[in-house]
Amino acid sequence: MQMDERKKKILRAIVQDYISTAEPVGSRTIARKFDLGISPATIRNEMSDMEELGLIEQPHTSAGRIPSDAGYRYYVDCLLEKSSIADDVKDVIEKETTKRIAEIQTVIAHSSKLLSELTHLTSIVIGPDKGKSAFNQMHFLPYEPGKAIMVVVKENGVVENQIVEIGENVTAEELQRIANVFNHKMRGHSMEEVKRDMLHEIYSELTRQRFLIDNALELLSAVLSNSPEESSKVYLGGTLNMLNQPEFRDVEKIRNLFQIFEEGAQIIKVLHPQKEGLAVTIGGENKLKELRDCSIITGTYWIDGEPLGTIGLIGPTRMDYGKAMAMVDYMTRTLTELLTVRRRN
C-alpha cells in the first residue's frame, strides 16, 4: 500500500491538529478544519488504510486517531515544511547570547534557559568536554605574597583558574616570561604531548624558576586531564515545562523522566554530535525507556570545525517539529558564530 498525495494530506492534517489540540482526530474534524475537498467518509477510509500501515493508531478511550511514532517519523522526513524564525525572536537570541559571550560556560547555560523559554519545551545544552581539550594559552595574575592566580584557556574555550605557589621574590616580568614560554611551546598540545616532547625545552628556557615551573605543570596536568569529573557539563532548562504537557500527567511517568534529567550522564549517552544538520529521535527510537514518550531534536555547535557541544530540545512526541527544529538550528548556528569569533579575537 502506497502513500499517495491524498493520504499524505490527511496524515499532515492529523499530525498538525493533534500537535495543536492534544486530542484524537476524527474524519469529521479533518473535513471541517482542513480544506481537502473530500468527504468524511473518504477520509475515514484513508485513515483506515494508514492505520494498517502503522502511521496512526486509536487510543483506547477515543473514536479518533493519533499519530504513531512511525507517523511522526514519516511526517518529519517527508511532509514537514521548513519553518522560519521571526526577526524579533532572532534579535532576542543574538542579543542575549552576545552580551554573555565573555565567559563560555555562562553563554552556554543561558542558551539553554533561553531556548526553553522560547519554545516552552525542555532544553538541553551539553558544554565542552573539559577533559578532551588541549592547551591554548595562560597568564598569571598577582594574588598574595608567594602566590599567583594561573588562568588557563583551553582550546575548546573553557577557562580554568588555579592558585599556584610561585615562591618568594618572583617579579611580574618573570611571570610574564614564563607564560610566554608556555604559550609558545604548548599551544595546541595535550598534556601527554607536553610531558613526552616538550619538558626538556621548557626547563632549558626557564632554568631559574624550577620550583614555579614544577607547580605550574602539576596544576596544568590536573586542568587538562581526562578524569571522569572533568567530563562535559549538562545544562537543562525548562524541565517543569513537561508538567504542562497532557502526556505527562501520569505521576510515575513524570517521576521517571525527571530522574533521567537529574542524571546528566544518562542524557549525554543519547545525544551524539552531528557532523551537519539536525538529529530528530522520535518516541520508541530513543534508547532510554524513560524517553519513549518523548522526541529529541539536537544539533552541534562548533569552533573552527571542531565540535564543541550539543544543543537540543526534549518534548512530547506531539511537539511542533517545525518550530522546534528551526529554533535548534538557529541557536546552533548563532553559538557557533559567536564562539568562533570569540576564539579568534
Curated annotation (Swiss-Prot):
One of its GO terms (molecular function) is DNA binding. One of its GO terms (biological process) is negative regulation of DNA-templated transcription. Keywords: Repressor, Stress response, Transcription, Transcription regulation. Disulfide bonds: none annotated. InterPro entries: GAF-like_dom_sf, HrcA, HrcA_C, WH-like_DNA-bd_sf, WH_DNA-bd_sf, WHTH_HrcA_DNA-bd, WHTH_transcript_rep_HrcA_IDD. It holds the Pfam family HrcA_DNA-bdg. PANTHER family: HEAT-INDUCIBLE TRANSCRIPTION REPRESSOR HRCA. Belongs to the HrcA family. Negative regulator of class I heat shock genes (grpE-dnaK-dnaJ and groELS operons). Prevents heat-shock induction of these operons. This is Heat-inducible transcription repressor HrcA. It comes from Desulfitobacterium hafniense (strain DSM 10664 / DCB-2).
